[in-house]
Amino acid sequence: MKKNWYLIIAAILLVIGGITYGYHEYNKPKTAQELKTVRVAYLPITHALPVFATKELETADGPVHVELVKYGSWPELMDALNTGKVDAASVLVELGVKAREQGIDVRAAALGHTEGNIIIVNNDINSVQDLKGKSFAIPHKQSTQKILVDLMLEKAGLTEKDVQIVEMSPPEMPSALSVGQIAGYSVAEPFGSLALEMGTGKVFEDPDHLWHDNICCALVFNGQFVDEHHDLAKAFTKAYLDAGTYLDEHPKAQEEISSKYMKFNDSVIERSLKVIGFKDLALTEDRYNALVHHMTHIDLIKKVPSYSEFVDTSLLP
C-alpha cells in the first residue's frame, strides 16, 4: 500500500513538473528571430515565386525572417490561413475574397504575379465546340481558372451544361490529360508547360484575350496577425514587393529560385516563366473591381466585400 502511495506522489510531481516546464517554455522571452518571423503558406507553383524570393533574399540582420510552410492543396492551405496556423499565404485571390464574404478576417496586400495562367487541351481538340460532352479540369471552383473557362465557354455559346467542369489537383492534370480522363484544363504554371513537355497537350485559348490583365494569386494575411503585428506585416509586404522587383530585373534568378522550390526539368521551368510577370504586383481598385465583377457574373459570390474591406493598403510601403 505504501509503495502505491509513493507511485501516486511521484506521478503527481511529474505532472506538476511538466506543467511548470510548459508554462516557462510558453512564457520565456522570444528570440530576436522569433520576434520577426512570418509563417507563409504556399503551393509549389510559379505564382508563389515572390514568396520564395523573399525567403532567398532575406538577411540575418534584416527586418523579417520568413518561415515557408508547404501545402498540397488549396483547401488545406486556406484552412491554415483562416485559423491562424500560418500568418500569410500566397493563395488564389478568389479564395480570399470568398473568405471575406463569409466574415473571415483575411486581408490582401499585393498580387502574386501578373498573367501566368494557361489553358491546355489534348491534341485532338481544335475548337471549344470539340469539348462538348467532355471533362475539363480546374484547380478549384473559386479560382481565376474557373472564371477563364466560363468565359471561354460563353464566348463559344456554351455553358457548363455542355462541358463537365471537374476540380483536380494541378499535379494530377498532365497525367489525367495523357490518359484521356480529361480533355483539357486551366491551371497555374508550370503544370501547363509540363503537358507540353510530355507532348500530350497543346496551348488552347490565350487567357489575356478572355480577361485582359487577369489576376490570380495574391499575398493574403490572417487579420489577427496584422492587428497584433502590423509593423512586421508591413515589413514583410515591403520585402515581398522588393522581391517582385528583383525577380523582374533578374530573369536568371527566376529560374534558379524556381528550380529550388519546384522539381521540374529546366525546360519546363524556363517555358513557364515566359508567360508570367512580377513587376507590377499592385492589387489596385480597378483590378479588384474586375475580379469581383467576374466572380459575381458566374455566381462565385453573392455579397461583394468592398475594396477597403479586403485590401489593406496600410500594409503598403
What does each of the following model-derived ranges do?
Residues 1-12:
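N-terminal Sec-pathway targeting helices
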Residues 18-23, 65, 144-164, 238-268, ...:
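Ligand-binding clefts/hinges and TM-proximal coupling segments of bilobed small-molecule sensing domains
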Residues 23-158, 164-167, 183-189, 200-203, ...:
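Short, glycine-/small- and polar/acidic-enriched structural segments
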Residues 49-53, 79, 83, 97, ...:
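Solvent-exposed, polar/charged alpha-helical surfaces in well-ordered, non-transmembrane soluble domains
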Residues 58-64, 209-211, 278-285:
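Short, solvent-exposed loop/beta-turn-alpha elements that line the ligand-binding surface or hinge
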Residues 93-95, 166, 171-258:
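Pocket-lining segment of extracytoplasmic ligand-binding domains
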Residues 227-302:
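Secondary-structure end/capping motifs
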Residues 296-317:
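Conserved C-terminal helix/tail region of periplasmic/extracytoplasmic solute-binding proteins
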